Amino acid sequence: MNKAKKNMKFLPTIVAMMMALCANAQERSEVVLNSWSFSQDGSEWQQVAVPHDWAISGPFDKRWDLQRVAIVQNGETEATEKSGRSGALPWIGEGCYRTTVDIDALPGFAELVFDGAMSEPTVYVNGRRAGYWAYGYNAFRVDCTEFLHSGSNAIEVRLKNVEESSRWYPGGGLYRPVRLLTAGKTHIDDWSLYIRTMSVNDGVAHVEAEGRVAGAQPDMTATMTLEGPDGSRTESDRLSIGADGKFYATFKVKDAQLWSPESPSLYRVVTKVIRNADGPRGGELVDSKTLKTGLRTVSVSREGGFRLNGISRKLKGVCLHHDLGPLGAAVNKAALIRQIRLMKEMGADAIRTSHNMPSTMQMEVCDSMGMMVMAESFDMWIYPKCKNGYARFFREWAERDITNLVLNHRNHPSIVMWSIGNEIPEQWSEEGRQISVRLQGLCHVLDPSRPVTQGMDRPDDAVRSGFAKVMDVPGFNYRVHKYDPNFPLLPQGFLLGSETASTISSRGVYKFPVVVSDHAVYPDGQCSSYDTEYCSWSNLPDEDFRMMDDRSWTIGQFVWTGIDYLGEPTPYDEYWPSRSSYFGICDLAGLPKDRYYLYRSQWNTREHTIHLLPHWTWPGREGEVTPVYSYTDYPEAELFVNGKSQGRIRKSIGENRNELSLDRYRLRWNEVRYEPGELKVVVYDADGRQAGEQTLCTAGKAARIRLQADRTSLQADGNDLVYVTVSLVDKKGNEVPTAADLMQFDVSGEGAFKCVCNGDATSLESFVEPQMHLFNGKLVVTVQAGQHEGTLTLRVTDKTNRRVKPAVMTMDVKK
């Protein structure tokens, strides 16, 4: 690097953006800072768009954060080498982001709002340290009023990630949005606004609201207005502002449209501060803030279990880590929408943000799409699970982190409970019980409207110590055999499966013979998609279904996990190459595994499910036993191979924790012998009437490329994404399930190649190079919209089989 480049700190070719802000006393301005320059560990500066994950480009390498540890949570007692535990990507190191902001007139107030920065961010404004936050997952605010001046202002954020600080892939950098808020000296404190529904009676919602005005003067008052989704308005009286700047309002909203997963109605809340409201012109507007929320009630009790809007329901939830697969940790609205849509179509109605604070963008998506949320905070407290984890900060920062979590997110109707921890080692101790009481109490002070929980993986110890007894919602992680003996000892009268299943599978992989096993591993680093393999501490989905169905006092579950994530490649923690999980109901690319349809058959009550497995293309297995399963909500089915019946069977209820319990939720033909041709299942309803069928055919040679997009057009904002599933089909249109061809991607027009993923946990191919091999016949390529209207074109070429013609897809990009 030459000297000139070293000195190019804030030149226009390097800095992220130049913008003009004018902040009069009456004007509030909020600008998203999305264009920055970035350098890692002293490397050359490059321009990047924020949100940005500095590590996702790779390359994969087992030396990144190579950990030699015993994973106590998994029951390990001896340390072994864990090569892919945190994703095998280069997230460790120091990074620096810089941008500039032009200000014409100095505002009375200015703050930088970070939705998360990985990690230990230190913020500088015009060379002066303005703020710091320890926890990379939390939102925080930096008051920079005194550091700004007229003209160009330099903003710098320095971050540091250290080794052995995470049990999964954390990402690195400014991976969530950064905003600059400017307002007058007198302004509404955004996080002070709090709207909660106290009760709903005969269609009338009783709502309380509050807020605080910084720099309030005696001649000022406030007003609040609730605007319904149908255009209805409910206005407050003129609100007095106390000496402490606080104001309070109550509303009676008639014909309230309540928020729920089935009907996610949202209200706009407009808050205004007025000076001299009795003046000749009706007063002067000092500040105004608009937010969205929903009206709904949440409660838990011995009598009703979990209730939303007064109606008892069992949570059908999944755990989701924060990474977005090939996008890494960098948050993206289109990617989040796709995740939530996949889970809702499966029938899920809740997610758990394991094991950390969620992004604001994710909560907004859950609000608008109707997905309940358990918003989690910590994976550890005082005692570390990894050498340099959050335990370093807990004593000093825990209360501040809980405060920011709750204040930042308490107006999101999707959040139905807070979680203060996951599998905390202190759960056996009096110290742990006291910390639970303290953190739960803080949540109650900041938000009395929601219950608090945490996930406990040592139920006997947690109950004995009182750790589980003091929680609003006792949550057990796995150990379904511990539910019955511990439930009578819990004073709450109900129990949540805060983390369940941990069944492992690889999409499109089937192992023979089929075994039910808690320790199965194979030389290829894959797991069987017959969904009969799990971990030593966990279980199969069927056991959780049985517990939810047969125990009235269970209030639901959160499955580990809804989608595969980077890092934690159990059961191949010691295997290389393996760098992402096998737990997902969907793979890392977001493609449903067979298990998706098992959950769908139990959870999606709006649509029927008929799903056959495995695929029916097995050259070399002719005449060999190849079991066939069907996942369906129907109770009975008959299977045919080339027209020959393999038997008509019904689901049966089993009471024991053994293989027979599978037959309660699955239809299984275990003695089918493979022969090429047609596999067909015919399903019957409870009255024995034929209700539907599904057919699989043996695939021939690949004849063409099939492209299936998850949407028909994109928004020209430079951020929107389309996910295109790429597969090979034969001349009859049958997918070739074993295809592993190398596919190449070219994007032209108003869009660009973003990333690609095939869901193979053992693949070391780059996510950001425009080519990748199919994994078991499929992959997903992601294309990003440009900033101008027009058309984008995706061209996919099979580099392995030149006889297959390239496939082309076009898509409109609209403003």
Report residues per predicted region.
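Short, hydrophobic beta-strand segments
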Residues: 144, 249-258, 667-673, 768-787
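Beta-strand-rich structural segments
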Residues: 209-212, 272, 628-632, 682-683, ...
